[in-house]
């Protein structure tokens, strides 16, 4: 393995839950700062980075719908939660000298930029991190699908998903002690085995556009930069297992 990154432009999907840290709700600023430092390592190595952040640490549309809320309204609330997370991450990145722009799929001009694909590409070409907020801007679509969509639109070489575990397992390793860990999978493996990596539409988008999905532990300091060089512990999902 070399220290040179294998990818020139990547999208990092961060779940809202990952930003809770040890808490049960909300944004843990120490965790946000640590993720920001990991991103800076990649930027310093010459990688162009964009992000999609979930909102499950604040509000999850599916949970709201399950409790009787109209699904569309619940999803819009979840999208607004992602904007809060995006602003927190922007603040953390800029505090350590990484120029960052937030673009929202739901226009809110006094808070951040609207999503404009060509502008986002130019930002990354200038070395800025772009954080895509508010998912796709449409209800009934997850932030995983938004991540796959933005990765395709931005021409990313890979989609990285930072989770609480170091790859994809046959079952939740926190609940099933003998769960099998996979180093490599195909897109069809994920769909056929119903592995809980991303939803089917996100997997299909990545597959159709030949974008590998790399699942790694966001809780491991420096893990993001390591995975980009091929040295980190992760699961790679592509056409070739």
Curated annotation (Swiss-Prot):
**The entry's keywords:** ATP-binding, Cytoplasm, Kinase, Nucleotide-binding, Pyrimidine biosynthesis, Transferase
Which of this chain's residues are annotated to bind ATP?
13-16, 56, 60, 163-164, 169, 172
Organism superkingdom = Bacteria
The UniProt record lists the keyword Lyase: no
Write down the SUPFAM superfamilies for this protein, in alphabetical order: Carbamate kinase-like (SSF53633)
Please state what class of enzyme this protein is.
transferase
How its function is modulated: the record gives: Inhibited by UTP.
Per the UniProt entry, the Enzyme Commission number(s) are 2.7.4.22
Quote the record's binding site residues for UMP. Answer: 55, 75, 136-143
**Main location per the UniProt record:** cytoplasm
Subcellular localization: Cytoplasm
- In the UniProt record, the signal sequence range is none
Tell me the GO BP annotations in alphabetical order.
'de novo' CTP biosynthetic process; UDP biosynthetic process
Asked if the keyword Transferase belongs to this entry, the reply reads: yes
Any single Gene Ontology cellular-component annotation: cytosol
- Subunit structure, briefly? Homohexamer.
Question: What does this protein's UniProt record list under function?
Answer: Catalyzes the reversible phosphorylation of UMP to UDP.
- Write the protein's name: Uridylate kinase
Question: What organism does the UniProt record list as the source?
Answer: Parvibaculum lavamentivorans (strain DS-1 / DSM 13023 / NCIMB 13966)
